[in-house]
Amino acid sequence: MNRIAVVIRAALAFTVLMAAPSTLLGQTLPAVRYGAGSSRPLSRLAFDGGVSPLGIQMQVATNLNSHFNLRGTGNLFTYSTTFTTSGITAAAKLNLASAGASLDIYPFHSGFRISPGALFHNQNQVTAAATVPGGTSFTLNNQTFYSANANAVTGATPVNGSAVLGLNTNKMAFSITTGWGNMIPRKGHFSFPFEIGAALIGAPTVNVNLGGWVCLDEAQTNCSSFSSTANPVGAAAQSALQTQEAKWVKDLNPLKTYPIVSGGIAYSFGGHNK
């Protein structure tokens, strides 16, 4: 958080110096001017469509002056798939939904920019329904277990459950990107912005809940309800699940700095900046 704040303050200070009508080291830096033909603040509007790891994105931007744009972003994407891992079949769905804003800073009269910002709305997550057919094996934390067959007498049912991978620990995630291209170009109306950076979404969370009956042997002579920690079989299965969850969380920890790489096409309305 402190590093992001330092970067943002440094970028803003540098840009203000570039835009101020003062003299530094004997050179006069470019000032923000609103002469004939110049675009006044909020006088231009641009829309952009593109893709990024956050999903299919739609953006809108307006000019503040010749060095600053204010940009809003919305991202949406869903994808469903079914796969089997370690004997567990998962019907998974990726849901990406986020929205945020950025201040595009152009320190030079070119397409290069620095963009501090934040995701104000972040509902990115993966959900899954898990099943293990009765009589088949599965592994948790390198331990082999067996899913019980349905039995009306004992009440046994095959192992099943749900899982949620949260990519939204920080409900407001600060971001910093850099890139090339101005959604509000000095000439023409079309532009092709590109940016790269990251959002600090926080460490991903993993929550897996399994139910049904689990066995220690294929013959199903030593079985228990998965949730029955009072039974040695259930206790062993729950312990293996908790350890496995911790490993998944560790493996996914690098995603706390969520990558942003995006490109798209933009169209702007209104007059042009000089």
Describe each region flagged by the PLM:
Residues M1-A36, A230, G270-K274:
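Cleavable N-terminal export/targeting peptides
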Residues F47-G49, V60, G72, L103, ...:
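Membrane-embedded beta-strand positions of outer-membrane beta-barrel proteins
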Residues S39-L45, I56, S66-F68, S110-F112, ...:
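Outer-envelope beta-barrel architecture signal
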Residues L255-K274:
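Outer-membrane beta-barrel "beta-signal"
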Residues R33-R40, G74-A101, Q123-M172, G202-I260:
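Extracellular/periplasm-exposed beta-strand and loop segments of Gram-negative cell-envelope proteins
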Residues L64-F68, I105-S110, N182-R186, F269-N273:
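Outer-membrane beta-barrel strand-turn architecture
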Residues S38, G50-S52, Q59-A61, D104-Y106, ...:
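Transmembrane beta-barrel domains of outer membrane proteins
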Residues V51-G55, G74-S80, P107, A118-N124, ...:
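Transmembrane beta-strands of outer-membrane beta-barrel pores
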